[in-house]
């Protein structure tokens, strides 16, 4: 949650895949109820379960759709999982709203502050900025390559009215921005005492947990977890696909990921 990459530069992974109770899970009605079951499987002793439940009750409150997700059937055997009803219309709102809530909870408990430092040419930046903007213990610095994003994403990142948000336009490419961020995580010399440096891209496992929840939710709504589904996932990186794979390792019936 608070470290991003492991000390050896690798990614954090669970020691084991927690298994779900299909008979219990298939009867849950709402996305929040699914999240209340899935998320505590990963928090272990780091957080009290009642604190996690309270946190989840207050996360994703700014989504347009009442149950956060809408599933539209377009053919007898084909449905569309609409993940764009969050505040920035990106599927990343699910993982980043959850991550920001856990960041804030941890920082408040430890009486510390944090800097979110990231690079983006798309929806990660706007989703991260929106997720963190109201938490005074988190300052967000997001590097954006000049001229390399859509107009709506530029506006999402540069018009947020919050003293905690600092979008920075860089005269360079996305790779240039990413290099600056990587060097920052290596040095960390600019950090104050009792201050974390946080990653918000898909290396942060909490983002994956948030996305695991909507794969289980969709499988419950479509066939009550009774038979394997195929998921076709438009994605720019492997994070969203990996969340689907992780759900299958936990017990969600899965045929293919396309």
Regions from the PLM with identified roles:
Residues 1-258:
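PLP-dependent amino-acid enzyme catalytic core
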């Amino acid at each position: 949650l608070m470290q991003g990459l492991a000390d050896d530069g690798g990614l954090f992974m669970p020691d084991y895949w927690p298994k779900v109770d299909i008979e219990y899970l298939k009867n849950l009605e709402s996305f929040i109820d699914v999240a209340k079951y899935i998320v505590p499987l990963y928090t272990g002793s780091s957080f009290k379960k009642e604190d996690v439940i309270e946190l989840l009750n207050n996360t994703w409150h700014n989504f347009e759709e009442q149950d956060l997700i809408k599933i539209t059937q377009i053919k007898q055997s084909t449905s569309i999982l609409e993940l764009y009803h969050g505040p920035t219309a990106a599927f990343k709102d699910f993982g980043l709203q959850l991550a920001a809530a856990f960041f804030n909870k941890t920082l408040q408990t430890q009486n510390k502050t944090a800097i979110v430092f990231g690079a983006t040419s798309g929806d990660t930046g706007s989703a991260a900025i929106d997720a963190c903007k109201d938490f005074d213990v988190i300052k967000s610095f997001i590097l954006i390559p000049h001229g390399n994003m859509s107009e709506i994403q530029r506006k999402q990142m540069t018009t947020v009215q919050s003293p905690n948000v600092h979008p920075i336009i860089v005269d360079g490419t996305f790779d240039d921005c990413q290099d600056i961020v990587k060097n920052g995580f290596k040095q960390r010399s600019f950090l104050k005492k009792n201050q974390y440096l946080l990653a918000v891209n898909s290396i942060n496992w909490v983002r994956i947990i948030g996305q695991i929840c909507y794969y289980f939710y969709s499988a419950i709504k479509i066939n009550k977890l009774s038979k394997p589904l195929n998921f076709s996932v438009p994605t720019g990186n492997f994070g969203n696909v990996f969340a689907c794979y992780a759900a299958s390792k936990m017990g969600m019936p899965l045929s293919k990921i396309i």
